[in-house]
From Swiss-Prot:
This is Aspartate carbamoyltransferase catalytic subunit. The gene is pyrB. Disulfide bonds: none annotated. One of its GO terms (biological process) is 'de novo' pyrimidine nucleobase biosynthetic process. Its EC number is 2.1.3.2. It catalyses: carbamoyl phosphate + L-aspartate = N-carbamoyl-L-aspartate + phosphate + H(+). Pathway: Pyrimidine metabolism; UMP biosynthesis via de novo pathway; (S)-dihydroorotate from bicarbonate: step 2/3. PROSITE patterns: CARBAMOYLTRANSFERASE (PS00097). It comes from Cereibacter sphaeroides (strain ATCC 17025 / ATH 2.4.3).
Length: 320
């Protein structure tokens, strides 16, 4: 199993063989999570601190559950009650926590690059749970696992990513991962929500939903991220749904066996028709939630193995 990373800060740092290693290990954790006894000792004796500077339900609870199932001591830092609210900087907070000798820091932050900066200042492994518009690596990995289990492969597929591309770290991480794994990627969005220069990733750009979905194996919808918008990017939610919301009529242009994905939380009737989101024959949205726990277990397991090996080498060096 190949995984060389000291931290997991983005998909950009991973080679295809490392991506496959994460997915293969995550597959085994899917099996474990379906058992009555859902326990491993992979992180036994280790401390995991979750630092979420943005609100999160799915991701934070998924990381917490993943750590506990691996046997870690898990602490959720309540940012609203922390010294950050009293003016303490991110680095001061990180250095304070670093002095307590944690083994894993799971960090979500509204500023792109904040997690990379933090990782350069601490002695433990750092896992990016989403930073601004930059990256959300575990979301892309769990999406890849969901696709592989549904389609039998994660190569040579046509994947359409639709919606708020401009503000989405999920889109960016998926675009990078799918490209590394030799897939054909299409981005579908109104011009106001298509970031400049995104075509450099080798993807196809569309502002017509039906044309973009034609022959797609996978349809990945994205949430409208109003909290990151500082202007009028769409005329109205009603008009947006009419042109870019996924319904049965638009999905008919994709392959007959195309799967429907959404990272959540969903705005039903805006990004996707509620009936379609719940269609067990097409939607794999709940599978994504399940795969999220397994993928995060795999990522933390692999980072912990590398951390233990690094500490072991350091200890030998001290003895010598």
């Amino acid at each position: 199993m190949t995984f060389r990373a000291r931290h997991l800060l983005g998909i950009e740092q991973l080679a295809p063989d490392e991506i496959r290693s994460v997915l293969d290990l995550a597959d085994s954790y899917v099996d474990l999570n379906r058992r009555t006894m859902k326990q491993s000792d992979a992180l036994a004796g280790m401390t995991q601190i979750n630092m979420f500077f943005e609100n999160s339900t799915r991701t934070q609870s998924s990381f917490e559950l993943a750590g506990k199932r691996l046997g870690a001591d898990v602490m959720n830092m309540a940012v609203a009650q922390s010294s950050v609210k009293k003016g303490e900087t991110l680095l001061d907070t990180a250095m304070t926590l670093n002095a307590m000798h944690p083994d894993l820091l799971v960090v979500r932050h509204p500023a792109s690059g904040a997690v990379n900066l933090l990782a350069s200042k601490v002695n433990c492994a750092v896992l990016n749970a989403g930073d601004g518009r930059h990256e959300h690596p575990t979301q892309a990995l769990l999406d890849a696992l969901t696709i592989r289990r549904a389609k039998g492969r994660i190569q040579r597929l046509t994947v359409a990513i639709c919606g708020d591309i401009a503000h989405s770290r999920v889109a960016r991480s998926n675009l990078i991962l799918l490209g590394k794994m030799e897939n054909r990627v299409r981005l579908i969005a109104p011009p106001t929500l298509m970031p400049p220069g995104v075509g450099e990733f080798g993807c196809e750009l569309y502002d017509d939903m039906k044309k973009g979905l034609e022959g797609a194996d996978v349809v990945m919808m994205l949430r409208l991220q109003k909290e990151r918008m500082d202007g009028a990017f769409i005329p109205s939610e009603r008009e947006y749904y009419h042109r870019f919301g996924l319904d049965a009529d638009k999905l008919a242009f994709a392959r007959e066996d195309a799967i429907v994905m959404h990272p959540g939380p969903m705005n039903r009737g805006v990004e996707i028709d509620g009936t379609l989101a719940d269609d067990i024959n097409r939607s794999v949205i709940q599978d994504q939630v399940e795969m999220g726990v397994a993928v995060r277990m795999a990522c933390m397991d692999l980072l912990a193995r590398n951390l233990r090996a690094e500490r072991g080498r350091a200890a030998v060096g001290v003895m010598v």
